[in-house]
């Protein structure tokens, strides 16, 4: 997320240098998600079959390479930059499918919400880091170094990952017998011997519920990740050098609330509450809270009111780690990576049409209210659809 969000901040001086209006900025910001969409299902299938370690590691190397090439691409032209962002998105596409393939093999059912809370808390952590550090780098060394610096971090991470990670607990050289027995207490997901049943997966109402919730969740998520710095800078008049310090507040709260929400969901399950009831309660809090916040934030006239509303939205939205976020592993643990690839393909679409639509609305109307209320309406629809069709019964094994 450092490599995603740095563009959201760096694009402000880039747009001034290259003369890009909101529509062209929307094209640059949304192009990442075209590539992100393309490799989701293939990435999940490869992770399920060959292991999340190698697929995730290669993905990090790929997206770090294209992060490194971003300044060169921008200098050549807008079209080349868009292509570069698409290729970067293809590298990042394997991330969550690989993580789900790893979690299905490493984490028992009653601990998965907390595990996803910890992992997903890296989203706001990386976002905060990029929001604070990117303006500092840009003002000290130029916007180009916002990409060079973070690309180097990616290469370092990949080297460490290949050294210490394992796709399955039984293959880790330092795992204890006690820990291995605990991890496998729910039964180890069986090995995939054939292609996943794609038609049956897509026809499942429960999986459709996850897809819709994921789509609606990501409409608001990607809107904030890509346009929040511009809203703070251009919409509310905050100085560029101060953007990170204001926008970090909602994401710091997300870091805390994701870990708290995951633990709460796991405790509810351990207390005997039905898994599907927990999933629906948490998802209602998440999408319902986000919908309410998006409906009103566009009317904020001061930075502190806007940040307060965004903070509440992020805190309530974090409840999704006990909702649709882990629902894939309830339904099809054997195909967790593939299923995440399917739903995340759907969820990448808002990154293309939602991010671009926001730029188009701003160019045609200048209305931030319309941008945010569209997101709120979509969140409300997702909440209702999930309540009607979600399930936590294992359907594929």
Regions found by a protein language model. Name each.
Residues 84-124:
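Cytoplasmic helix-loop-helix junction between adjacent transmembrane helices
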Residues 5, 33-41, 93, 127-128, ...:
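Residue-level signature of mid-helix packing/kink "hotspots" within the transmembrane helices
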């Amino acid at each position: 997320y450092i490599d995603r969000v740095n563009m959201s901040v760096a694009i402000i001086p880039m747009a001034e240098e290259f003369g890009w209006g909101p529509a062209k900025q929307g094209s640059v910001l949304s192009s990442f998600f075209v590539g992100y969409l393309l490799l989701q299902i293939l990435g999940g299938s490869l992770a399920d079959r060959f292991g999340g370690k190698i697929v995730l590691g290669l993905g990090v190397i790929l997206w770090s390479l294209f992060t490194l090439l971003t300044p060169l691409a921008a200098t050549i032209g807008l079209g080349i930059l868009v292509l570069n962002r698409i290729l970067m998105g293809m590298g990042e596409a394997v991330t969550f499918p690989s993580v789900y393939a790893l979690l299905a093999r490493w984490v028992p059912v009653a601990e998965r919400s907390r595990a996803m809370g910890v992992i997903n808390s890296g989203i706001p952590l990386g976002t905060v880091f990029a929001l604070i550090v990117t303006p500092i780098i840009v003002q000290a060394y130029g916007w180009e170094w916002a990409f060079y610096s973070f690309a180097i971090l990616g290469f370092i991470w990949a080297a460490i990952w290949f050294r210490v990670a394992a796709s399955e607990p039984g293959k880790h050289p330092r795992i204890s017998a006690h820990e291995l027995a605990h991890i496998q207490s729910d039964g180890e997901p069986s090995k995939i011997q054939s292609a996943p049943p794609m038609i049956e997966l897509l026809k499942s109402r429960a999986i459709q519920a996850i897809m819709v919730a994921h789509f609606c969740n990501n409409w608001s998520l990607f809107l904030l990740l890509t346009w929040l710095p511009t809203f703070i800078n251009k919409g509310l008049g905050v100085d560029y050098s101060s953007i990170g310090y204001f926008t970090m507040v909602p994401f710091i709260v997300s870091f805390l609330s994701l870990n708290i929400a995951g633990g709460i969901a796991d405790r509810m399950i351990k207390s005997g509450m039905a898994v599907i009831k927990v999933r629906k309660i948490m998802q209602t809090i998440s999408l319902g809270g986000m919908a309410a916040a998006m409906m009103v934030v566009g009317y904020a006239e001061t930075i502190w009111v806007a940040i307060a509303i965004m903070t509440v939205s992020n805190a309530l939205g974090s409840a999704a780690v006990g909702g649709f976020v882990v629902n894939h592993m309830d339904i099809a643990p054997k195909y967790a990576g593939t299923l995440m690839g399917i739903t995340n393909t759907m969820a990448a679409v808002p990154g293309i049409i939602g991010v671009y639509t926001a730029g188009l609305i701003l160019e045609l109307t200048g209305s931030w209210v319309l941008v945010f209320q569209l997101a709120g309406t979509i969140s409300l629809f997702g909440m209702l659809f999930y309540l009607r069709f979600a399930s936590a019964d294992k359907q594929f094994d």
